[in-house]
UniProtKB/Swiss-Prot annotation:
<protein>
    <recommendedName>
        <fullName>Nucleotide-binding protein Acid345_2028</fullName>
    </recommendedName>
</protein>
<dbReference type="InterPro" id="IPR036183">
    <property type="entry name" value="YajQ-like_sf"/>
</dbReference>
<comment type="function">
    <text>Nucleotide-binding protein.</text>
</comment>
<dbReference type="GO" id="GO:0000166">
    <property type="term" value="F:nucleotide binding"/>
</dbReference>
<keyword id="KW-0547">Nucleotide-binding</keyword>
<dbReference type="GO" id="GO:0005829">
    <property type="term" value="C:cytosol"/>
</dbReference>
<dbReference type="InterPro" id="IPR007551">
    <property type="entry name" value="DUF520"/>
</dbReference>
<dbReference type="InterPro" id="IPR035570">
    <property type="entry name" value="UPF0234_N"/>
</dbReference>
<dbReference type="InterPro" id="IPR035571">
    <property type="entry name" value="UPF0234-like_C"/>
</dbReference>
<comment type="similarity">
    <text>Belongs to the YajQ family.</text>
</comment>
<dbReference type="Pfam" id="PF04461">
    <property type="entry name" value="DUF520"/>
</dbReference>
């Protein structure tokens, strides 16, 4: 019988992040408490940079951005917040890095959980994804349920279902 497989990945949809940033920017420009505060949100390759006039206003900008990201189904677990630091012109900034791919130690932890479950499935790390294969589709569904119930500190998605 042929093997069935799927990949466990951790990715953020950058188009949805871009849309959320545009919506948050519009709200910042129209909110009374944030007018004339030099508050802005910039999207970089794998990070979001927030600027504002002080920490209180930066926190408000962060809350607006988080609300817009949640509405667009972008997982907040995939974001890592940097420290708030002083910037030029008496402003503060914060960098938020976006998780793209599963880090090595988290991938090893996922593989260990699958192996410890004693299910008849093989898990292997392939770059920044974890491939799980088994002869039985039901076993794969049980593993998906197992992984969803565990908290690895990252957001995981299941993609690339294959039946060979």
């Amino acid at each position: 019988m042929a093997d069935n497989s799927f990949d466990i990945v951790s990715k953020i949809d950058l188009q949805e992040v871009s849309n959320a940033i545009q919506q948050a920017t519009k709200e910042i420009q129209t909110r009374f408490d944030l007018k004339d505060t030099k508050s802005e949100i910039k999207l970089e390759k794998d990070a979001i940079e927030l600027h504002s006039s002080d920490e209180y206003k930066l926190k408000a900008v962060t809350d607006i951005l988080q609300g817009k990201l949640v509405k667009r189904n972008v997982p907040l677990k995939g974001l890592t917040y940097g420290t708030i630091e002083s910037a030029a012109g008496a402003t503060v900034r914060q960098k938020i890095t976006m998780q793209q791919g599963i880090p090595g130690e988290k991938a090893k932890e996922i593989v260990r959980v699958i192996k410890d479950s004693k299910k008849k499935a093989q898990a292997s790390i392939q770059g920044d994804t974890v491939r799980v294969s088994s002869k039985d589709r039901d076993t794969l569904q049980e593993i998906i349920a197992l992984i969803k119930n565990k908290d690895f500190g990252i957001d995981v998605q299941f993609t690339n279902y294959r039946s060979n």
